[in-house]
Amino acid sequence: MIKIKKHRRNPYTTSDEVYALGQHICMSAHKARRIIDQIRGRSYEETLMILELMPYRACYPILKLVYSAAANARHNRGFNEASLIISQVAVNEGTTLKRLNPRARGRSYLIKRPTCHITIALKDLEFEPLDRYMLRPKPKNTGWLGWLKKG
């Protein structure tokens, strides 16, 4: 099972990136990086073609994350999927699951199942930031002596 976590962002932000984070994926980070290096900087459609045709087991969870990030872009920000590119991709090592394999004469061998965390950021090439009039300026923090400066 892949746990997909979505970053909560301000809907009025001027950022043109949308994220999807997959945590505790049962595979080595080294094997996931082999796939990630092939798709970094490519368009969304080209990435889907590459991931569907590559013969590696690591392609399936990465493909699900790319689909999830594109769904986030379409639903949350209203981006067009044809203009999305993969801007940032990161693979970090997760926790290692440790299991015992029983052996002869009461011994046991340790089995280590590595996990990894994959973050995918999609960027829209046709994104136009909001007008500066729509974004409210932050109020000035005058501190507790602000009333002295008024008079």
Swiss-Prot record:
GO CC terms in record: chloroplast; large ribosomal subunit
Subcellular location(s) of the protein: Plastid, Chloroplast
UniProt KW keywords: Chloroplast, Plastid, Ribonucleoprotein, Ribosomal protein, RNA-binding, rRNA-binding
SUPFAM superfamilies per the UniProt record, alphabetical: Ribosomal protein L22
Gene Ontology terms for molecular function: rRNA binding; structural constituent of ribosome
A GO BP entry: translation
Protein family (similarity comment): Belongs to the universal ribosomal protein uL22 family.
Function: This protein binds specifically to 23S rRNA.
Subunit structure: Part of the 50S ribosomal subunit.
Protein name: Large ribosomal subunit protein uL22c
Lineage, uppermost ranks: Eukaryota, Viridiplantae, Streptophyta, Embryophyta, Tracheophyta
Originating gene: rpl22
